[in-house]
Structure formats: C-alpha cells, structure tokens
Amino acid sequence: MYYDKTSRSSAICRISAAERRIPMAVMDEFKEEREALKNGTPKQKIAYFLYYYKWHVIISVIVIAMAASFIYQYANRKETAFYTVLLNASLLDQMSSDQPDFITDFAEKEGIDPSTSEITFDTSIRIIEDSMDETSVTSSQKLMVYVAANELDSMITDFSSFQKYANSSMFSDLRDILTKEQAQALEPYFYYVDREVVLAIEAANDDMNTDYTPEYPDPLHPEDMQDPVPVGICLTGCKDLTDNYYFRGDGIVMGIYANAEHVQTAVDLAEYLLNKWKVNLV
C-alpha cells in the first residue's frame, strides 16, 4: 500500500496548528471572564467564585474541621486510670450522664485527678451464652479485642457470667498479686476455680472436642477441689454496686485480668467496696 508522505505531513501540521489554537482560545475566554468579573456586581463575583471553587472550599472546610477535631480530642484526651467491664450489668439510672458517687469518692481516695485521668465502668457488653444472638456475638468479639489490647483491668459480673471466663486462664491468681496481709484479709471473699478443670477444658479445646462438658465445682468451696486457685473476689452485698447497677444473675464477683495495667487500683477498689460496707460473705 502506498502512503503519501506529503499529505500526511500537511495533516499533522494542520492538527498541530489547531491544538495550538485551543489553549489560546481558552486563555482568551479566561481573560474575558476575568475582565467581566472585575466590572461585575458583588452578586456576580460570588456566583463566579462558587461556580469555580465551591468544591475546593467544601473539601478544605471538611479537612480543616477534621484536623481541628482530632487536635482537640488529642489535647483533651484523659489518661485511663482504671477500666473495668461490668459484664451483663446495666446502670439503674439510665437518665443520668454522671458516674455514680462512689466512683468519684474512690478516685479521690486513690489520688486520681478527674481533669486528667478517668475511671471507666463499662456496661456496654452483654453476652448470653445460651442464645449467642447478634448482640452476644458482637459483645464477645468486643471483649476479646479489649483483652488482647490490654484495655481492661478487671471484670465485675454475676457468678454465672463469670464462670466461663474464670476457667479460661484470663484472670490472675490472686496469690501472685496480693501481699501476704492482703491475701489474709481477702481470703474469705475468694472465688476459686479448680486448676484441673481448667487444664481439662484447655485440652478439650486443643483436641477440638466439642462434646466435652466440664463439671464446675462450687467456687466458694476450695476444699472440694483438687487444685484450687483464687481468681476472683466476691463483692456480693456491696451496696455501691447493687444500688447503682442491675446484674443479670446472682452474686457479684471481680476478677483481675492477667495482663491488667492497673492491678493495684483493682485491688484497692475491692478493698474499698468490702471495707466500706463490712460485707459478710453469704
């Protein structure tokens, strides 16, 4: 096939000339608009600005607002002095946004400055093992994330809700974190698990034995266990808890997480509640 090189070159030249004319036309139009804008009314100037720069302004405002919000939150962020999850519990006074008075009193006794630090009693986690509905599944996942991230110091809940977690090696052996004097004073309030049962549960999980059903001994009777380990402190009867929170089941117990960052504060809270109400274990 024969190509006419002369014709092809002429066509290219014509295209190039046209391309050069396009930017010139745009520039001429832009100059005309600027000239018209210079002599336009304020309303016309605003309309012109909004037409060409509206989205630039909107995006800039959003970015600035987000940056300002982040800086404000960071500057006013309080340190966590103590964080406990109240599993399957709810605040009785749902209309109040203030913490119960006993938390403020405890913080003061601990020397915790509320302007820079905070104590959190989280009642947002509800898990019903028998049904495992959507709320239970979501709460279970949330709880595991909190534990893995070292966010939690302790769990306060009823005996039934505590049982599964108490037998999963999540909580500290109280003998490892209490002084000799503290252990002697708190021993009447200990909640025990049998280490042999815990090991059997772990073995069944490793073998993926879904048919295994553990038999839990009475947590208040270590004499009936092969290897009793205190993992909880019974707070049943502490009116600061029962007057402010509703617990789904009977009894109240607190476990201190093995990876807790504020262990001493957790121990101090248990002592504060028990000493304040002179609780007799039932």
Regions found by a protein language model. Name each.
Residues 78-80, 85-159:
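Early extracytoplasmic/lumenal segment of secretory-pathway proteins
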Residues 247-264, 281:
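A bilobed periplasmic-binding-protein/Venus flytrap-type ligand-binding module shared by bacterial periplasmic
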Residues 226-255, 273-282:
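Periplasmic-binding protein-like
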Residues 2-23:
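Short, Lys/Arg-enriched N-terminal segments with co-localized hydrophobic residues
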Residues 132, 136-223:
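Extracytoplasmic "Venus flytrap"/periplasmic binding protein-like
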Residues 31-44:
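Short, membrane-interfacial amphipathic segments enriched in basic
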